[in-house]
Amino acid sequence: SLSSLILSEALILKKDFQAAKKIINISLRHNKNDPKIYYLAAKIYFLEDNLKKSKNLIDEALKLNEDNIDILFLLGNINLKKNLFAEAIEVYEKILKINNGFWPAHNNIGLANFELGKIELSKTNFINALKNTNNAESMLGLAIVLFTQNPDNEESFNIAKKAILSSPKFINSEFRKSELWGVEIQKITSQFFKKNKELNDY
């Protein structure tokens, strides 16, 4: 039922995955044709780093609704977390054909392209992500791209400062990792924060 799904979503937010799984398993026994149930189950396993199980469940969700942005975004994130960058980009681009204003897809294409060494493309992706929203993640991503292209670029510092003032948790490398920042961009971001130590005080 709808109330069960709402409760399981609340439990996922609280990171009470075991309780959420129990509700979802009961829901699946009663209704095997609701893509939302498979999606929520896939989300739990994704957060638990069980990517194989998450992928199997998201495939079931896609059979029932192949154009749902939430379902597609989770599939893209599974690919990104597995370092399947080209596959992730392909899924995110499918989302953008449905809704070009969905900034998280632009942002995550930027993350994938950075890992592929396509820095100029990554810059375009982060700029596109910022067209409709001043989200901290894409601002910091853009700052790191500019820093990569020119370590003495003052604009990169100013953009990063704005991002950190908006969301200080992006200073934390573990938090960035949870947001699917890959090895290459994490490495450069660490160099950036070492060079600009004053940003750690915000």
Q: Model-found features: residue ranges?
A:
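Structural signature of tandem alpha-helical TPR/SEL1-like repeats
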Residues: L13-I26, L47-E60, K81-K94, E115-N128, ...
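Terminal, low-structured helical/coil segments at or just beyond the last alpha-helical repeat
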Residues: K162-Y202
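Structural marker of alpha-solenoid helical repeat scaffolds
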Residues: H30, L64, I98, K131-T133, ...
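Ligand/cofactor pocket segment of small-molecule handling proteins
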Residues: E66-L116
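Residue-level recognition of tetratricopeptide repeat
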Residues: E9, K43, N77, L111, ...
